[in-house]
Regions:
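Start-transfer (signal-anchor) and selected internal transmembrane alpha helices
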Residues: 1-22
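Membrane-interface alpha helices of multi-pass inner-membrane proteins
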Residues: 152-180, 204
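Membrane-interface micro-motifs in multi-pass membrane enzymes
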Residues: 56, 104-142, 325-349, 373-402
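Transmembrane catalytic cores of multi-pass membrane glycosyltransferases
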Residues: 25-72, 172-173, 187, 192-349, ...
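Signature aromatic-anchored transmembrane alpha helix within multi-pass, membrane-resident enzymes
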Residues: 287-292, 340-367, 371, 410-425
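Transmembrane alpha-helices and membrane-interface helical segments
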Residues: 83-90, 136-143, 178-186, 267-274, ...
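Short hydrophobic alpha-helices at membrane interfaces in multi-pass membrane enzymes
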Residues: 143-163, 193-198
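Transmembrane-helix motifs of polytopic, lipid-linked glycan transferases
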Residues: 75-101, 136
């Protein structure tokens, strides 16, 4: 207790997060789902044999090591979890640092330690760790976009981190867009960046390498997954895959009684409370309350007997069946229109809560990145089989937006503060 009191107030949430996570990790079960499979394979195979046919060499190497020595993971993962919290805090500015850090430390536990449907080791090493590495790589880019420069040791640290981050396909695409976009932006400002350019090239090369390993050749990973999870996947057009990514994402967020809908409900309730506290206009309040009300209604409807809600299958287009069987594709216009309405309401609420065009644009781009990270699963036959862990990045963007809103609306604080710039320098 004395040690905690000796730490500065704004840093105490990180200290408590690390200590609590370390204690909990000592007792986590590691013998279920993919963790059990990998533990068996790692005990029987050499590393070279384990990596045979792998498209994620670095993450699978770490999976192999931790499957053989799980105590190492129990010691290291709390450290990575804390690094993620510190990195998010570094990227986002807020006058009330203690509140910001507390919200971050509590919020990251959900995607990092609850959405672990592949097992704790497999999910964290393949999702939590790449996201953490990717966000660390964005700190120098943020600094350069704000007029700073990148020191030599940032190259030494961030290039290896990038190689690990791009082992996760979703993070590879997101980082490619961000680094290419950042490099082009700096060029337009007549400040071309060696760091952004180098990282953009590495991301593009990794993107091609990932595509080659996953999709090229007989017996590729893509072919195996199509046969196992989505036999009709090759019949889908590009438009079908985009629509599948969109509808599957919002089905899980608003209609499926599981982890993703809980996170979306909390986020939209936060938006609704903020809107109600900021404005008394009935139109704003109706817009804000629609997404959480929609989610509660359809999640509860999905738990009722089919005879009690005969309209549900018509609205969902049969999506409720895909989670437990080989997937097929169906297009339901009403379902997509409802999802679009939810999107518009969320954007309107955020737009109303953010002050200034730049702040709104930043929030919208952040949400778009999160949505895009999940929508790209429409281009994978494991769009359903991958489970809720593919929402990891999207749920973190909810957290990013929540911190932005807290910063832009001092009246939500216990102690009123003047808002500062959205992203820290």
């Amino acid at each position: 207790m004395h040690l905690i009191k000796s730490v500065k107030t704004e840093y105490r949430p990180f200290f408590i997060l690390f200590a609590g996570a370390l204690l909990v990790h000592l007792f986590l079960p590691l013998s279920w789902s993919d963790d059990a499979v990998f533990a068996k394979e790692a005990s029987e195979l050499t590393l070279a044999a384990f990596l045979n046919g792998s498209s994620r060499l670095l993450t699978d190497t770490m999976t192999y090591v931790f499957a053989r020595h799980p105590f190492l993971w129990r010691m290291l993962n709390p450290f990575v979890l804390t690094i993620l919290a510190v990195t998010i805090s570094r990227l986002l500015a807020c006058k009330n640092e203690t509140l910001k850090n507390t919200v971050i430390c509590i919020s990251i536990l959900y995607p990092a330690m609850v959405l672990v449907d592949a097992g704790f080791i497999a999910t964290t090493v393949n999702y939590l760790w790449p996201v953490t590495c990717g966000l660390l790589c964005l700190i120098p880019l943020q600094r350069e976009c704000r007029g700073g420069y990148t020191k030599w040791y940032a190259y030494v640290c961030c290039i290896p981190l990038l190689f690990y981050a791009v082992n996760m396909e979703q993070m590879c695409v997101i980082l490619t867009v961000l680094f290419v976009g950042g490099f082009l932006y700096l060029c337009t400002q007549k400040k071309p960046s060696l760091y952004a350019g180098l990282q953009a090239l590495l991301c593009l090369a990794s993107l091609y390498y990932t595509y080659y390993l996953n999709c090229v050749g007989d017996g590729s990973r893509m072919e195996r997954e199509i046969s196992r999870y989505f036999p009709s996947f090759l019949q889908l057009s590009v438009w079908n895959k985009v629509e599948l990514g969109f509808s599957s994402t919002f089905y899980c967020l608003t209609m499926d009684a599981a982890y993703a809908s809980v996170a979306f409900l909390v986020f939209t309730l936060f938006l609704a409370v903020a809107v109600f506290r900021k404005s008394s206009k009935i139109s704003f309040r109706i817009t804000a309350i629609f997404p959480p009300a929609f989610t509660v209604f359809f999640v509860i409807s999905g738990l009722l007997p089919a005879k009690a809600v005969p309209f549900l299958s018509y609205v969902t287009g049969g999506m409720h069946q895909y989670l437990v069987a080989k997937a097929t594709y169906s297009f339901a216009p009403l379902r997509d229109l409802l999802f679009i309405a939810v999107c518009i309401c969320v954007l309107c609420s955020i737009g109303m809560l953010m002050c200034g065009k730049q702040a709104r644009l930043t929030a919208f781009v952040t949400l778009a990145a999160g949505l895009g990270s999940r929508m790209m699963m429409g281009f994978s036959p494991t769009v359903w089989a991958s489970g809720y862990r593919t929402f990891h990045i999207m749920l973190l963007t909810f957290l990013f937006c929540a911190i932005m809103i807290l910063n832009q609306n001092p009246q939500l604080f216990i102690r009123k503060e003047k808002p500062v710039e959205i992203f820290s320098t």
